[in-house]
A protein has these predicted regions:
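A short glycine-rich, His/Asp/Glu-containing loop-to-beta-strand
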Residues: 1-21, 27
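Short, surface-exposed charged micro-motifs
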Residues: 10, 30, 84
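Short beta-strand His + acidic residue motifs that chelate non-heme Fe in jelly-roll/DSBH
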Residues: 20-22, 40-41, 75-77, 83-88, ...
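Glycine- and acidic-residue-biased ligand/ion/polar-headgroup-sensing regions
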Residues: 26-48
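Double-stranded beta-helix
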Residues: 47-69, 82-106
Length: 106
């Protein structure tokens, strides 16, 4: 509902899934792995644009394994932290964020 002030969703991910490096400036993100195996990768931005005015550049600073079989269930990604995922096997995750959904195109 548009009145709901939280975002909750299940997300099915396959190996090879491409999740662009991104961040959320209005909310932290909680990710819980229900099944499968993936790594959540945190980045630091090393340049706002490359020398041709192209894409931002990042360096990996931390990697968290999520795999329920190993007792590694979830991670809290702080507000504003650049992140992505590296899917190692078919996985299902639960994601939760604060606040109503706002399209990235806005």
């Amino acid at each position: 509902s548009a009145l709901d002030q939280s975002q909750r969703m299940l997300n099915a991910l396959e190996p090879g899934t491409q999740v662009p490096v991104h961040r959320h400036m209005e909310t932290a993100e909680t990710t819980i792995c229900i099944e499968g195996y993936l790594e959540v990768v945190l980045y630091a931005e090393v340049s706002g644009q490359d020398e041709t005015g192209g894409e931002r550049k990042f360096v990996e600073v931390f990697r968290v394994t999520l795999c329920p079989r190993e007792g590694k269930y979830g991670v809290q990604i702080p507000l504003g932290v650049w992140h992505s995922v590296d899917v190692k096997e078919p996985s299902t995750i639960f994601e939760a964020k604060d606040g109503a959904y706002v399209s990235a195109s806005r």
